[in-house]
């Protein structure tokens, strides 16, 4: 009888622990160390606070969200665990920040993108390498990858030491319009998520990548609060629709022509 009681108590404890553990994650798992060499972290210089994610697209440029802008920031590359430093981690500062100023046929939903030129080139290493830009737009129905050091609880904020990765589905833009009627009829954004809920990007994942077929297709932009609600996907700035702007700046064109 005593043995049965002990085993029953152990089972209760185990089930309780499993339930609490599952409540600590907005979907996803710790990223594999080798799968996010392009993922960068943006920090505030004065407070040291972690702000946002971003993506290294070549040795001199990082792509992130415009709303991540702060006057004094630095960019950390090659990081996995905030508590343990790799030998090849590197820190850079913005040399110049570029924002999408175009107004013709563009709404505020189309402009949450920022290109940062670093103060000096990054050295590729075991934990640092750029992610390729797309040559074509992503297809609805694609399974895409998101990642970041954003909060793992919502609405209360709990920041992890390691980045979390998850797979989400690329949805038709009309799905997001059906949920959020204030969205414009046409937009240079992507709609993505898991309609069953439980998996989502969240606060401080902003600026991080949406990766489809190994290419940077989106930048984490906006989502409903709390995060990971059923039938409430999130919005991602569509990188392909801003490709000419990005490539013109990298090529040194200071008078970038806005797309039609």
From Swiss-Prot:
Enzyme Commission no: 3.4.21.-
InterPro entries named in the record: Peptidase_S1_PA (IPR009003), Peptidase_S1_PA_chymotrypsin (IPR043504), Peptidase_S1A (IPR001314), Trypsin_dom (IPR001254), TRYPSIN_HIS (IPR018114)
Domain of life: Eukaryota
One of the protein's GO biological processes: proteolysis
Principal localisation: secreted
Keyword Protease belongs to the record: yes
Disulfide bonds: 31-165, 52-68, 102-258, 144-212, 176-191, 202-227
Cell location: Secreted
Coiled-coil segments: none
Cited function: Thrombin-like snake venom serine protease.
Name of the protein described by the UniProt record: Thrombin-like enzyme 2
Species per Swiss-Prot/TrEMBL record: Trimeresurus albolabris
